[in-house]
Amino acid sequence: GPALATLLGEPDLVGDVLASDLNPDAVEMLLDNLRRWDRKEYPSEPAPISRLHEDRIAGLADATKLQHDPNLAGRWDMLLVNLPHRTIEILPSLVPLLDRTGPSMVRGRVIAAEADIHEADRAIRHALPPRLEGMPEPSLRIKRDYSSTLRLCSFEAWIAPAP
């Protein structure tokens, strides 16, 4: 999505990228976007997740199962979670992807009723490992209305290295 485009647009900011989706149409769009942002060749058709370049792994995959691949677990400094209807539910299965040898970051989007935001904040904090000392606890920020009763929110969490 747009967050990845912004990150890839910054010189020398992004190293390896892992991107997956279960939806073939979303993967096709991802590959089109990577082609534009990276100015590299990418497949035109979605396929199961694989290494497409030395520093790019992308394709069709269930993100909740990636933690079981020893080549992917524990390697990533940042997670961008853009499944707003399921972010809180799947966070525990994504955390094992983080490289906990140093600080890392999780950014996500959540759809929640405004009255439920404080409970969603608690659920996010519970799902994540200890946060980096001195950084604020993750807290949902309303980005825009999703419907008459629901809000599209975002959060950011700095994760402490494992002891």
Locations of the language-model features?
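Residues at the starts of beta-strands that form the adenosine-phosphate
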Residues: 15-16, 105
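S-adenosyl-L-methionine
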Residues: 16-76, 86
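Conserved SAM-binding loop of SAM-dependent methyltransferases across substrates and taxa
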Residues: 1-14
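Phosphate- and divalent-cation-binding pockets in alpha/beta enzyme and binding domains
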Residues: 6, 29, 89
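C-terminal catalytic and target-recognition region of SAM-dependent MTase-like enzymes
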Residues: 64-65, 72-77, 84-163
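Residue-level signal for beta-strand positions within conserved beta-sheet cores that form or flank
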Residues: 13, 52-54, 102, 136
